[in-house]
UniProtKB/Swiss-Prot annotation:
Keywords: Seed storage protein, Signal, Storage protein. Transmembrane segments: none annotated. Residues 1-21 form the signal peptide. Zeins are major seed storage proteins. Belongs to the zein family. Expressed in endosperm, mainly in the peripheral regions. This is 22 kDa alpha-zein 4. The alpha zeins of 19 kDa and 22 kDa account for 70% of the total zein fraction. They are encoded by a large multigene family. Structurally, 22K and 19K zeins are composed of nine adjacent, topologically antiparallel helices clustered within a distorted cylinder. Interacts with OP10 (via N-terminus).
Length: 266
């Protein structure tokens, strides 16, 4: 009899604990409709467990993401890939030129890289065109610096002090590059003066446009040589008088045999 009473009390205790207990899914993938079947009405209304709240929030976020059209997401990804492809193609177009410039003149390469972030270059392309033209003469100036550093330094000093360089730097640099063939032209003067005069015409654009600026340029370039050597001064004066001397144009060989006015040779 006592055993029956104890067994009944145990069954009542188990029944009471089963009615008051509720399930808390930790890592369950069951939908919320199934979970609510095991929850008491009081806990589902206002006393829900934090783990269940996090699970329902996760389900709501996943549902909102899945509701977006898949085609819209694909269009966004394709647009991003297209922009990256265009940027890569533009970089590949300039890589050979920039690599060659980096090998020839690293300083000019760094200056070119900084040019993209220059507000003046982005705002005013016309103002940046002389700087782009100067880049064409950098390889020749770099070779001059390697072969003859003293001549390169003298070239830079003349570039900063010459009015022609300030007004038109590309024309000035082109004129300076033409001066590198002066030794060969000097030998041509001795051998054939008429051919020398004909040789100067197609290469000297500054003489055809502005002869006064050309004469001033030659004086500024070769003035240190004229001070050191009177023969050079006489030669320069003869070059200035030659275009205006009719006798020189008729027979340059006999003209060079005549006395040089104001020169050191008679």
């Amino acid at each position: 009899m006592a055993t029956k009473i104890l067994s009944l009390l145990a069954l009542l205790a188990l029944f009471a604990s089963a009615t008051n207990a509720f399930i808390i899914p930790q890592c369950s993938l069951a939908p919320s409709s199934i979970i609510t079947q095991f929850l008491p009405p009081v806990t589902s209304m206002g006393f829900e467990h934090p783990a269940v709240q996090a699970y329902r929030l996760q389900q709501a976020i996943a549902a909102s993401v899945l509701q977006q059209p898949i085609s819209q997401l694909q269009q966004q990804s394709l647009a991003h890939l297209t922009i990256q492809t265009i940027a890569t193609q533009q970089q590949q177009q300039f890589l050979p030129a920039l690599s060659h410039l980096a090998m020839v003149n690293p300083a000019a390469y760094l200056q070119q890289q900084l040019l993209a972030s220059n507000p003046l270059a982005l705002a005013n392309v016309v103002a940046n065109q002389p700087q782009q033209q100067l880049q064409q003469f950098l390889p020749a100036l770099s070779q001059l610096a390697m072969v003859n550093p003293a001549a390169y330094l003298q070239q830079q000093q003349l570039l900063s002090s010459s009015p022609l360089a300030v007004a038109n730097a590309p024309t000035y640099l082109q004129q300076q590059l033409l001066q590198q063939i002066v030794p060969a032209l000097t030998q041509l003067v001795v051998a054939n003066p008429a051919a020398y005069l004909q040789q100067l015409l197609p290469f000297n654009q500054l003489t055809m446009s502005n002869s006064a600026a050309y004469l001033q340029q030659r004086q500024q370039l070769l003035n240190p040589l004229a001070v050191a050597n009177p023969l050079v001064a006489a030669f320069l004066q003869q070059q200035q008088l030659l275009p205006y001397n009719q006798f020189s144009l008729i027979n340059p060989v006999l003209s060079r045999q005549q006395p040089i006015v104001g020169g050191a040779i008679f």
